[in-house]
C-alpha cells in the first residue's frame, strides 16, 4: 500500500543526468542553472510535482511517470520498486521521436522488455500521437497528452513588440540527425534575403558546414548554445521560426516559440500540429512551407491572423492548466 507523502506527479528518469528538481510552487522563474519547466519536466511542473533520477524519492508520490531510457534495465528495476510501494505507474519514452524509439527497440531483447514493462504499467502515456499504436499493441490504457507550456505565467512570456522582430530563427541545429533536414532548411533560408539566425552545436565541423552555404556576410548569424532564458530572448527577436524537421518529436522548439509568441513554420511534432494548424509540416511539402514562410514575412495581415490563432489555440490546448486537467483525468492523486 502506498502512503504518499509528496504531492503532484513524480516524473522519474532513473539514473539520468538531470538532477532531482521540485516544482512544488509551479514553474518558478526563468533560471540559467536549473532545468526549465518544459518537455517531461513540464508534466511535473504543471501538477506542482517533481522530476527525479532517484527511484526511492519518486516512490513517495501516489502517481509516477516512469521514463523508458537506454536498454530499459534501469527502468525495469525502477518499475519493480515503484509497484512494490503501491504507486500508480505510467510509462513513457525518454526520447520519443519515432526514429529514436525504433533505434532503442531495435534489439529483440529490448523490445521484449518494453512489452513486459508497458503491459504491466497502469498507463502508457505518449507525448506524441505517433507512438500510440506501439503502446496500444501491448496495453489497453494508452493516452496522448502533449507536453504543456507555462503560457499563463507572466515570467515565461518572452514576447516582444512586432516592430522589434526581424528575420528567421532556424529551429533545427544538427546536420547529422538526418530526419531534422537541417541542410535542406538552411538551403531554403539562403534564398529569402532576410536575416537568418542558427545555433551551432557541432563546433568547428558545424562552422565549416555553415560557411559552405556561402550566405552573404551580413545575412547569417551563428550562435553557440545558450542558457534557456538567453535562448528564448534571442528567439523572441525574430519574426518566425522555420524548420523542416520530420522526426515526429514532442515539439519543444515549437513550444519555445509559443513562449516567445512567434509562429513556427514546419516541423511535424505534436506541439506543431496543435498550435500551428495552418503552418506545421505534417503532410506539407517543403515547397509549401517555403511559401508559408514568405507569406508570414511579407503579409502583415496573415502574420497577425497567425499570432491571434496562436494565442487562442495554445492556451486552450497547451497551457499548464490544460496539462493538469488532462493528467488528472488519467492519473490519481494530482489534485
Give the positions of each predicted feature:
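Donor nucleotide-sugar binding/catalytic pocket of nucleotide-sugar-dependent glycosyltransferases
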Residues: 122-157
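Conserved catalytic-core segment of nucleotide-activated headgroup transferases in glycan assembly
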Residues: 23-29, 151-153, 158-212, 222
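Membrane-proximal helix-turn-helix segments that form the acceptor-binding/catalytic region
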Residues: 104-123
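A charged, aromatic-enriched C-terminal amphipathic alpha-helix characteristic of glycosyltransferases
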Residues: 297-334
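N-terminal pre-catalytic "stem/leader" segment of glycosyltransferase-like enzymes
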Residues: 1-85, 282-283, 321
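Short hydrophobic beta-strand element within catalytic cores of glycosyltransferases
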Residues: 261-267
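Acidic donor-binding loop of glycosyltransferase active sites
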Residues: 236-249
Amino acid at each position: 500500500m502506498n502512503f504518499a507523502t509528496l504531492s503532484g506527479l513524480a516524473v522519474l528518469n532513473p539514473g539520468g543526468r538531470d538532477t532531482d528538481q521540485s516544482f512544488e510552487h509551479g514553474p518558478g522563474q526563468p533560471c540559467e542553472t536549473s532545468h526549465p519547466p518544459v518537455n517531461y519536466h513540464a508534466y511535473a511542473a504543471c501538477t506542482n510535482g517533481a522530476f527525479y533520477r532517484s527511484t526511492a524519492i519518486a516512490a513517495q508520490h501516489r502517481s509516477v511517470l516512469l521514463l523508458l531510457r537506454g536498454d530499459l534495465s534501469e527502468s525495469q528495476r525502477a518499475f519493480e520498486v515503484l509497484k512494490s510501494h503501491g504507486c500508480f505507474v505510467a510509462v513513457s519514452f525518454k526520447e520519443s521521436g519515432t526514429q529514436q524509439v525504433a533505434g532503442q527497440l531495435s534489439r529483440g531483447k529490448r523490445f521484449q522488455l518494453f512489452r513486459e514493462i508497458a503491459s504491466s504499467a497502469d498507463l502508457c502515456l505518449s507525448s506524441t500521437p505517433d507512438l500510440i499504436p506501439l503502446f496500444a499493441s501491448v496495453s489497453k490504457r494508452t493516452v496522448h497528452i502533449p507536453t504543456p507550456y507555462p503560457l499563463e505565467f507572466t515570467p515565461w512570456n518572452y514576447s516582444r513588440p512586432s516592430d522589434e522582430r526581424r528575420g528567421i530563427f532556424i529551429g533545427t541545429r544538427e546536420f547529422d540527425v538526418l530526419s531534422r533536414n537541417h541542410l535542406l532548411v538552411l538551403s531554403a533560408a539562403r534564398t529569402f534575403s532576410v536575416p537568418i539566425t542558427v545555433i551551432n552545436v557541432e563546433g568547428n565541423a558545424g562552422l565549416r558546414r555553415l560557411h559552405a552555404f556561402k550566405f552573404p556576410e551580413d545575412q547569417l548569424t551563428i550562435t553557440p548554445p545558450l542558457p534557456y532564458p538567453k535562448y528564448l530572448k534571442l528567439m523572441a527577436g525574430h519574426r518566425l521560426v522555420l524548420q523542416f524537421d520530420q522526426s515526429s518529436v514532442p515539439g519543444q522548439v515549437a513550444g519555445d516559440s509559443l513562449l516567445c509568441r512567434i509562429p513556427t513554420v514546419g516541423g511535424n511534432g505534436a506541439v506543431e500540429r496543435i498550435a500551428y494548424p495552418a503552418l506545421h509540416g505534417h503532410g506539407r511539402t517543403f515547397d509549401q512551407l517555403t511559401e508559408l514562410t514568405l507569406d508570414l514575412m511579407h503579409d502583415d495581415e496573415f502574420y497577425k491572423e497567425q499570432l491571434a490563432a496562436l494565442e487562442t489555440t495554445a492556451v486552450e490546448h497547451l497551457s499548464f492548466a490544460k496539462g493538469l486537467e488532462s493528467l488528472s483525468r488519467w492519473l490519481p492523486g494530482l489534485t
